[in-house]
Curated annotation (Swiss-Prot):
Chain positions recorded as UDP-alpha-D-glucose binding sites: 288, 357-358, 375-383, 397-400
Record function comment: Glycosyltransferase that may possess chalcone and dihydrochalcone 2'-O-glucosyltransferase activity.
Keyword Glycosyltransferase in annotation: yes
Superkingdom of source: Eukaryota
Family: Belongs to the UDP-glycosyltransferase family.
InterPro entries named among the record's database cross-references: UDP-glycosyltransf_plant (IPR050481), UDP_glucos_trans (IPR002213), UDP_glycos_trans_CS (IPR035595)
UniProt keyword annotations, A-Z: Glycosyltransferase, Transferase
EC primary class: transferase
Protein name listed in UniProt: UDP-glycosyltransferase 88F5
Length: 481
């Protein structure tokens, strides 16, 4: 079987897709004669498995040197009233025996050159070491968020209170221009009494103990101060920082994305975009889990209507529990019922609203698209950067508030919306109108667009023969061969 690189994805289709993209990059660069890729993934109650089998069949067919190993089903044992993050982290730990068995079996017929894990799969780090396999992390957000995570054990020492109670208190991270509010920390660390808090501290403390960290970004995109803070050891003041390899941007090809959305509606929105003037359309899409209460949808609609701008807006079904934005949108809802009366009719000449899903990568590359309202999920950020489209930053969950800070203040490729933290991040219609006009009409918006266009060219160059990301991938492979 030769040399193999084993990747271990955290639960869920999004994490598997990220690992597949890394595997594809390695195979594309070095060919299947050099490395084959095996991706380990979990099966159980916390995993959304509906879209996974079809996706894996597609990848296995188109990339035969990438194979998949699904673990036996694990039933989560936790019944206590704890957070979803804590339940997921416990679920991953329960898969440790399967990780050990998989590495044991693979090692019998192949030389495992590297074991690459997701941050949430940190409990597998000592297993890789146990087999004397060089073990790396694949970090799927940007360098600024990585700097924060590396530094987080030091932040933990600065207070004994929960960040959710500190709210407006700000914390400084090495290399960042602006501090982060306590309430904008990643959700699993907001409550010090949640088991997920100690899990996250453990994950962050183990990052430096790996053989290296592979990051889905490219050097030219990142603030030099952040890159210097990581390389100079400021983020891990108590010990050595492992090598960091910036190998992105890794973006999934649209043809391999899920085609669950209505094909006719998808074609309609692309045809509509082709008829609009250059850089005139604002695209609004908040990721696979970005669902808003009806009251917020009405404010967005009012802001868009008042702005007078052309728009393509992806609307997901409002969540049943309004406090939760992490609910998958589906098509079984009345679009007119969640928007202001007459909105669709009044804006029909300059706007289009689609339910649940649009082919984001294709949309962002359309000549008519001039701006993107995003939840700041890192994949979406990279897709916008590659397409050269400036952003309005509207973070919802995960590390997105961290990304917002850096996109607006350090990278200067986005305008931030003002969110009312005391109202769950609510944004008024007036604020929507203000930021939309700022991006689409002002000199500042034009400057952002120019900057994004240049970064798009740099993204392409980074993956070229002499680019920074190619050099970093060569350095990674040199470290394992």
């Amino acid at each position: 079987m030769g040399d193999v690189i084993v990747l271990y994805a955290a639960p869920g289709i999004g994490h598997i897709v990220s690992m597949v993209e890394l595997g594809k990059l390695i195979v594309h660069r070095y060919g299947p004669h050099k490395f084959s890729i095996t991706i380990l993934y979990t099966c159980g109650s916390v995993v959304d498995i509906t879209s996974i089998p079809a996706y894996i069949r597609r990848i296995s067919h188109s990339h035969p040197s990438i194979s998949f190993l699904q673990f036996p089903r694990v039933t989560n044992k936790i019944t206590r009233n704890i957070s979803g993050a804590a339940i997921m982290f416990d679920f991953i730990r329960q898969n440790d025996p399967h990780v050990r068995r998989a590495l044991q079996e693979i090692s019998k017929s192949a030389a495992v050159r590297a074991f690459i894990i997701d941050l949430f799969c940190t409990s597998a780090l000592p297993i890789g070491k146990e087999f004397n396999i060089p073990t790396y992390y694949f970090y799927t957000s940007g360098a600024a968020a990585l700097a924060a995570f590396l530094y987080f054990p030091k932040i933990d020492e600065q207070t004994t209170e929960s960040f959710k109670d500190l709210r407006e208190t700000v914390f400084e991270f090495p290399g960042w221009k602006s501090p982060l509010k306590a309430i904008h920390m990643v959700e699993p660390v907001l409550d010090r009494n949640d088991p997920a808090y100690s899990d996250m501290i453990y994950f962050c403390s183990q990052l430096p103990k790996s053989n290296g960290i592979i990051v889905n970004t490219f050097e030219e995109l990142e603030p030099p101060s952040v890159l210097q803070a990581i390389a100079g050891g400021l983020c891990v003041p108590d010990g050595p920082t492992p090598p960091v390899y910036y190998v992105g941007p890794l973006i999934e090809e649209e043809k391999e994305l899920s085609k669950d959305a209505d094909a006719a509606e998808k074609e309609d929105c692309l045809s509509w975009l082709d008829k609009q003037p250059s850089r005139s359309v604002l695209f609004l899409c908040f990721g696979s889990m970005g669902s808003f209460p009806a009251a917020q949808l009405k404010e967005i609609a009012n802001g868009l209507e008042a702005s007078g701008q052309r728009f393509l807006w992806v609307v997901k079904k409002p969540p049943v529990e309004e406090k939760s934005k992490q609910v998958h949108g589906v098509d079984d809802f009345d679009l007119k019922g969640v928007l202001p009366e007459g909105f669709l009719e009044r804006t029909a000449d300059r706007g289009m609203v689609v339910k649940s899903w649009a082919p984001q990568v294709v949309v962002l590359k359309k000549e008519s698209v001039g701006g993107f309202v995003t939840h700041c999920g890192w994949n979406s950020v990279l897709e916008a950067v590659v397409a050269g489209v400036p952003m309005i930053a509207w973070p919802l969950y995960a590390e997105q508030h961290m990304n917002r800070n850096v996109l607006v203040t350090d990278m200067e490729i986005a305008i931030g919306v003002e969110q009312r933290d005391e109202e769950g991040g609510f944004v008024s219609g007036e604020e929507v109108e203000r930021r939309v006009r700022e991006l689409m009409e002002s000199e500042g918006g034009r400057a952002l667009r120019e900057r994004c266009k240049k970064l798009g060219e740099m993204a392409s160059a980074a993956l070229g023969e002499t680019g920074s990301s190619t050099r970093n991938m060569v350095n990674f492979v040199s470290s394992i061969t």
